[in-house]
Each structure stands twice: as structure tokens, then as C-alpha cells.
A protein has these predicted regions:
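Gly/Ser-rich "nucleophile elbow"/oxyanion-hole loop immediately N-terminal to the catalytic nucleophile
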Residues: 1-22, 32-37
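Residue-level marker for beta-strand->alpha-helix junctions and adjacent short loops that shape enzyme
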Residues: 48-49, 65
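Hydrolases whose catalytic domains are alpha/beta-hydrolase-1, hotdog thioesterase
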Residues: 26-30
Length: 134
């Protein structure tokens, strides 16, 4: 992370981690072990709240028909995160449910009816969420 930051001249306040499946699990690990290196995280088709790090912005993508990482396990992870970070539901727009905590840290959860495949239609919302944090 340090080498990439130096080589590509990135700064943590403008750097986000995103990963799908195992990569999504790695996003959760980065949240726990290197939270200072990222402004926010976007795990997709993953579970991982056991890595619980400090309060940070999250855009989570989960699919109800995922047979590799069952939706119930993904849901348990994000419900745990909602409770740990003291998030309150702020509304729903389409497939995205928005949350914020009393300090203004935000989380959005995109839920679709797909399988374990990456939900490409989640990308515009993810990009908009990250841009809103800059």
C-alpha cells in the first residue's frame, strides 16, 4: 500500500478499496488492519464484519441468490456493521438503502436479486458514493 501510494502519488483521503468475493473479504481485512490508508471501502459478495475496524464509509453490494457467500451471511455482516457503527437508516432509492451515524459517516447497501457474479449495475451508485466523499 505504501509503495503504491508513493509510485502513483495517491493520498488516503482519496483512496478507496473495492473487492469482489475473496477480494471483498480482503476489503474487510484492510478496514481492520489498514484503515488509515483508505477513505472508504466497497466489498461485494463478501462477509467480514469480524474484522471490525474504526467507523468508515462503506458501500456494500449483496445478492439475494448468492450460493457461494449466502445472502444470510452477508446480511449478518452488514447488520453487525450497522450496529457497531451506530448507523441509522436514512432512506431507500431503488436497490440502495442509505445509512448515516450521528457523526455523519455514511454507508450504502445495494441489494440485488442476482447470484455471486459481480453486480455490474451497482457500479454507478458505488462511483457516486465515493465521489460524494471527496
Amino acid at each position: 500500500i505504501t509503495k503504491a501510494g508513493t509510485e502513483f502519488k495517491t493520498v488516503p483521503s482519496r483512496t478507496f478499496a473495492m473487492g469482489h468475493s475473496n477480494g471483498g473479504g480482503f476489503c474487510y481485512a484492510l478496514w481492520r488492519f489498514r484503515p488509515d490508508a483508505f477513505a472508504g471501502f466497497a466489498p461485494t459478495a463478501a462477509k467480514g464484519s469480524r474484522y471490525a475496524g474504526p467507523v468508515k464509509p462503506f458501500y456494500i453490494v449483496a445478492s439475494r441468490n448468492d450460493t457461494i457467500v449466502p445472502y444470510a451471511e452477508q446480511e449478518a455482516s452488514f447488520k453487525d456493521m450497522i450496529a457497531r457503527m451506530k448507523m441509522e437508516e436514512k432512506g431507500t432509492k431503488g436497490r440502495i438503502t442509505q445509512y448515516a451515524n450521528p457523526d455523519g459517516v455514511r454507508m450504502e447497501i445495494y441489494i440485488d436479486g442476482g447470484t455471486h457474479a459481480f453486480a455490474k449495475d451497482s457500479v454507478p451508485g458505488m462511483v457516486a458514493f465515493f465521489r460524494s466523499l471527496l
